């Protein structure tokens, strides 16, 4: 059975949830082979998790160069493996970095590219959810080694113990024109889950009315242990920072539960959250488009509904 390369997403010595999802998706094409790219010592704490997720092989590409250059080390490693192992495909998370890596890799190896798929099927077929979830389409990439980016949360991870054979591979020296990292400024981490990794997301829209009123959204999110998101309208109005924007021009999420407070549901927003497993919408406008895709809808004042829900959750937790 042909290998399927999976670029592992990791942070601070731990696997990101999407890595297990990618390994599950890879089984539709062949035998999952995880690819860990990082500085020396990166792979060791990830091995057990990758085996449990189902990785038959783990390629370990470690070098100090990885931390000094943007994107190119991962592209170089994957391109080398694509040439040496002739995989049935390459799966990468549909993050900002992942999409750039995928595009560069596809161009490098002369292969077709499928972006932001919600499922992977036999024969290199990717399933896309388009037009705010109104349509589902299938596409097939040209070439022997399709490069596919998969939306985080779209595929349900199904652990299946893998052999996890470790193989060391070299990280090639960066080209002279590679973008070099000259300085780093870590983002201030909060207590809430990362937006694209969260199981539950509570998002606010223009209907929240002000930055101060977003405390209602945050309170509900904190009661659920959820991440906080915002629509583009809320971000453009200055209600919440842009790094939390959900939608076509923001982040794409696919949590188990998505609660939309005061969000009308423009197609651009729906494009970023339509694959959420369960959608709950609260809006005073009963004609709001968000209700078209909501599993549960409440027509009412979010400033009455959300606090009641927050208190009910706190009471239930004791």
Curated annotation (Swiss-Prot):
What is the similarity comment for this entry? Belongs to the ETF alpha-subunit/FixB family.
InterPro entries, alphabetized: DHS-like_NAD/FAD-binding_dom, ETF_a/b_N, ETF_a/FixB, ETF_alpha_N, ETF_asu_C, ETF_asu_C_CS, Rossmann-like_a/b/a_fold
Q: How does it assemble?
A: Heterodimer of an alpha and a beta subunit.
| Gene of this entry | etfA
Task: Describe the function of this protein.
Answer: The electron transfer flavoprotein serves as a specific electron acceptor for other dehydrogenases. It transfers the electrons to the main respiratory chain via ETF-ubiquinone oxidoreductase (ETF dehydrogenase).
Single GO term (MF): electron transfer activity
Name what cofactor the protein needs: FAD
Q: What protein is this chain from?
A: Electron transfer flavoprotein subunit alpha
Q: Which UniProt keywords apply?
A: Electron transport, FAD, Flavoprotein, Transport
- A Gene Ontology cellular-component term: cytosol
